């Protein structure tokens, strides 16, 4: 399932324009020099003086609500909510508020995929086609058969971000796999199909068993449930932007009665369930909302939603050395995930496995990832794995980029290069 965006972008548009930021640094990077350590050695909880002005910044950028969470020493230590969850009702953002994580969905799924690698269910350098070859792949593109699991996680698959017409447009590569970065939600969705094929589990069930429950992310979901229905925030377009239908919310509400009729909850749906439900969904929905089975499914690249503190628990889980199997990936896999895999900007930015990496000083790197859904939700996370420190910001406004950048600068003391690329 995909979120909508303005005009022609429709249900897939936000994914075409979604933020491509993502990052995590190696846990065993060389230590910082003393001067550099002092420069960044302070907690990432924003100051009271900054927070006193935050509502003014939110108003300036047309952002109704913000959630912030901070990790220190590998533990969630602070979270705060600001503004309103819904402009019409005036309901305040609180600890239960569920945000659309947007492309922050990708690092979470990457972590689950790496757990499957550790379990021997997947191999990083084996091709996706070895495990599962969807029928929507182009039949005249041999490069599709060379895309590996590693290529997906470091965005070197050569695939596009999203097809504009998936109901009639075969998926084909834009570039040779493994040779450069092509940010691709399609690649993550194909890997999702692979994971569902080899495990026999839906994305949401797989994530819940392998990650959400062990990490304490009890209110997170890739689909829709009663908690999300009660507590989801409502996004607001940026000032002057064309209003956009919030199709994730609209789609899930239309699919709920179909799921009940089919006798299978939405979190348990896999591809064949979506194929079966598509005719009924199309009959119940406005034209163009559901054009192929992928519009009915959870989406590893974009549909995660949850409270800001749940995502901070994920960041803490990634950096906590004592998580241990089956709660976490192995240390060897963790090092591969957080190490440079593909250069983005030589000497400064790299792709890890599911994350982007930004060099801070010497060989030390921070991790970060951004997200954008439907021109209404902007999200960002950044962390310092050497100090096991992290920051998560989620907003329900299309102008949220300007807000989260100011929060990151105020909390970390750093103006990230990624903000200018």
Regions found by a protein language model. Name each.
Residues 60-69, 88-151, 175-186, 299-302, ...:
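Short active-site loop at a secondary-structure junction
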Residues 1-13, 17-24:
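N-terminal secretory signal peptides
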Residues 40-99, 121, 164-174:
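Short, conserved catalytic-motif segment at the N-terminal edge
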Residues 369-370, 378-397:
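Short, well-ordered beta-strand elements
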Residues 346, 360-364, 394-421:
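Short, gly/Ser/Thr-rich active-site loops of penicillin-recognizing serine hydrolases
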Residues 86, 139-372:
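Short, surface-exposed loop or secondary-structure junction motifs
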